[in-house]
Amino acid sequence: MFKCPERVSVKKKEDILDLPNLIEIQIKSYKQFLQIGKLAEERDNVGLEEVFREIFPIKSYNEATILEYLSYNLGVPKYSPEECIRRGITYSVTLKVRFRLTDETGIKEEEVYMGTIPIMTDKGTFIINGAERVVVSQVHRSPGINFEQEKHSKGNILFSFRIIPYRGSWLEAIFDINDLIYIHIDRKKRRRKILAMTFIRALGYSSDADIIEEFFQIEECSLKSEKDFSVLVGKILADNVLDEASSLVYGKAGEKLSTAMLKRMLDADISTLKIALEADENHPIIKMLAKDPTDSYEAALKDFYRRLRPGEPATLANARSTIMRLFFDPKRYNLGRVGRYKLNRKLGFPMDEESLSQVTLRKEDVIGALKYLIRLKMGDEKASIDDIDHLANRRVRSVGELIQNQCRSGLARMEKIVRERMNLFDFSSDTLIPGKIISAKGLTSVLKDFFGRSQLSQFMDQTNPVAELTHKRRLSALGPGGLNRERAGFEVRDVHASHYGRICPIETPEGPNIGLITSLSSFAKINEFGFIETPYRIVRDGVVTDEIEYMTADVEEECVIAQASANLDEYNMFTDPVCWARYRGEAFEADTSTVTHMDVSPKQLVSIVTGLIPFLEHDDANRALMGSNMQRQAVPLLKTEAPIVGTGLEARAAKDSGAIVVAEEDGVVEYVDGYKVVVAAKHNPTLKRTYEFKKFLRSNSGTCINQRPLCSVGDIVVKGDVIADGPATDQGELALGKNILVAFMPWYGYNFEDAVIISEKLIKQDAYTSIYIEEFELTARDTKLGKEEITRDIPNVSEEVLANLGEDGIIRIGAEVKPGDILVGKITPKSETELAPEERLLRAIFGEKAADVKDASLTVPPGTEGVVMDVKVFSRKDRLSKSDDELVEEAVHLKDLQKGYKNQISVLKTEYREKLGALLLNEKAPASIIHRRTADILVQEGTVFDQETIELLEQESLVDLLMPPCDMYDVLKNLLSDYETSLQRLEVNYKTEVEHIREGDADLDHGVIRQVKVYVASKRKLQVGDKMAGRHGNKGVVSKIVPEADMPYLANGETIQMILNPLGVPSRMNLGQVLETHLGYAAKTAGIHVKTPVFEGFPESRIWDMMIEQGLPADGKSYLYDGKTGERFDNTVVIGYIYMLKLSHLIADKIHARSIGPYSLVTQQPLGGKAQMGGQRFGEMEVWALEAYGVAHMLQEILTVKSDDVSGRTRIYESIVKGENLLKSGTPESFNVLIKEMQGLGLDVRPMVVDA
């Protein structure tokens, strides 16, 4: 069987860890959200299940009616993803939810249809209205607690903390200049400022003694004589000291003891005092006790409420319910598992499952946070402030969580409606059932809005496989709940030490989004809390083990991590006593005995696209950024070619992007053609798997998707083998460009400013030819004036224009079209107007039809030409208008379909029976199997499975079987689940086919009778003005296509294919391109492909050795001869092979001209831009140029009749038609606009006509 070609490398040893699935971030998250394939009772409390459990049960206001959620059930998709794209519909499944309603009449259960939910394709994308979209993961500030510091204008450092919940009110505490702590709620600083002591009391710590006990250690001291005074004076009391008989107070908790106070206490025979250790009068808690206006729980509650809601009556009940609602009601305040995890970790609380499930705030949290804040103030070395840009404080919301939040808001909206309906329902006249009070609109409209309009749901970049892959791995800090592009500062955008191995430091867009949109590093994963983890090898006693530990940024802080390039011996021990390592974000030379972990691979630092750049370590970071971004813009070429110099990631990137077809199981190839491959399974040759290819489909960006088989009949395939190549892949490897023989030299000035000179030979060989596919759509609707009609019979159009249209008015496949050609003929009824008498007479003589329609045909727009490659027609069938012949044909068709459906079901049942037999026959039952509804024991523990028992199990559905977890039954459950899903899918497909035969395309929008889609393919050859680039950020525009005979040539007569400017290298500092040139030349001559992975590539010495081995010049420079004169150039020139890409900025899409066109409404000046059919702006500096030449008439013409002189425009048009040559300019509209603006300011400005 075909295998990806081996690449030669100088890498000492392979990575011990394979890359994870590169689109796992998308697939895993959405799978967890929907939990497809799990039984209702087995579902975990996450995703959609969690939302339903949170919102339900819903009770009516009088609590007489209760609506409970039981479970949800997802259907199977009606169409395949490809069919959804073809029809322009959403790839989704139905959502049905089972509810139980309890009211005065009894208990009723019902399954309610709740609309449809879009589901993810195997490639990690969604299909919404026929377009593939990606939901980008969002990086946001993690819920939890953050400690910060800021400098006051007086120079004091003020410490503060914020408790940020997942949902609910923020709680902030900050020191003021007097060392008092104030609490702010919801960031409204001025109005909601509450003394921390008041807030502590409002939480339930009523007495001063309770509060002191929370913050200080208490010690009992004896007071026996005046000798004890010296020890006690200046100490702080921890409890009130009073005479119980007379209730006389000698000292209050929090007071400082003086000699006088102690004398009074001694006189009153008080012998023991409780003292707060480490407390003094300057301690923030003691200061706040003195400052606090309240002295009890009730007073504190009322004071809290007064400050929170000034103007409202502060009753105890109101105050208590407000504080409960703000922080202790799980429906309104939720820290989430993440927030609780962060808070417990920071404050040193337990990390067990029970503690992490506490989602609301606790009193202990506030006390713990205040203690930590005071420790910071006191200068405790173990207390530290948080860096908000550290990845320990930023987390990722993946697609599942983003959609879960949308579902939550949709169901919360529905909850209100359900309550209202419960209250308004008239029980006397009707019976209440769940379906009558549940409205699915809330949920479906929210999902529709999210997928269609959200900033994070994006039209997938599908220029090439890498663009697609990167889009799914993208991280965005923008979007709802994220940052704002205008307000995001430098710190947020900057590379942080904690990004190592988690976020790529190179790949980010240039421009306003720099640093806000990033990409996941190659080995990174996202854990259950949403934090990015990266793998490390564990080091024990100086030995680097093969054990892998995935670590989050905060855990990594405590580890000393060696680089992957550290030298090891054959026993995996460090050979050197010191090595480069990282600790707390700093790099230093560490003693190898202190190292705890080691990097898995040098490429774990960078993202996939950056990892595709050979010799990345020799490129300047700014150019590497451009190189990463430009690989995503490379257009798939007609003839693909893998790079001679790669990095070893090409095959993996192609595989995980979904561009190529990969074998899903072992087997033998039985049949191959251009459209499909059939593989017979190895374990059972009667089971055959068909792999269908995508043929000439249009991608989102208009490029062509086409898959070609790589195997032959009789080939043995193994799971994971490449069966077919896709767009921009070659032999299963990514192939974005071409290996081109280049020379770095100036050539007649044509490569000035990074321009590129190419040989005509590349054009002749179709080296950079790409195929673009345009889709044109036309719909015929049922209008108020009558039905539109798709027809060949179009008024006032000659027969030769209609030559390529078929009988039905649709262009034939294979027709060559150019701008203005008709693709689909359509006539539309005209609105009836009052007719002149002679017209009415003509109508009476020649019949009604001819005049009351207008031509509304679909024509080819300017700038597009090519070949019609496909036509798709969708239409509804009218049951009543079918002829008898059509009805007979339909019946035959339906009969055949039913027969095929029954055959498929019997094949499926046979397969299922065989698999059951293979698993169970003659095996002992490890545990009893019980029928869930009847509680009958179907299989007794220890029973040996025979044919009869297996047949009994075959009749049951998975929902009805209760099986204890064990290996055998887990496999049985999966078998049953797959079988039931396949049955369901067969049934849905059968019903869809029946519906299609009877009703046509019922999915068409309301009012549409017929819809036609025409696909026009055009070949784009490389031409002057196209943008080209290498992988090192070396970009340029084709400036000249030179005949092969005129290009410089080598001594052996071989002509150079492309000439680059040598001045593009030194200042750009991307030497990677020069090393690639040399290594490419040596490898091409040797006839091999090489891989030079990031940071462990070919050393320079090895490249020179290879050059000498192949008989090439040792310095990589050769003499060239001028193709025009045949003379040798004076100096030697660097020549070699570089992998060059053609980017999607093609001149054909940009070139544009206008004679007349639309004008702006206000200024009456021509619009700008190709899309608006606009003109070129003749700006201020251009006017100066004409003024300098003194061309008065041309200047007047440009500023008036060619721009915004409305009457002059019309006159000049007339004079051109009449053949006259006169220019009479009028008043430009801009003058009128100026006058109106001045009048708008209240100035009475009027133009005056003055006689000369």
UniProtKB/Swiss-Prot annotation:
One of its GO terms (cellular component) is DNA-directed RNA polymerase complex. The keyword Nucleotidyltransferase applies. It catalyses: RNA(n) + a ribonucleoside 5'-triphosphate = RNA(n+1) + diphosphate. Its EC number is 2.7.7.6. One of its GO terms (molecular function) is ribonucleoside binding. DNA-dependent RNA polymerase catalyzes the transcription of DNA into RNA using the four ribonucleoside triphosphates as substrates. HAMAP family: RNApol_bact_RpoB. The RNAP catalytic core consists of 2 alpha, 1 beta, 1 beta' and 1 omega subunit. When a sigma factor is associated with the core the holoenzyme is formed, which can initiate transcription. Belongs to the RNA polymerase beta chain family. This is DNA-directed RNA polymerase subunit beta. It comes from Chlamydia felis (strain Fe/C-56).
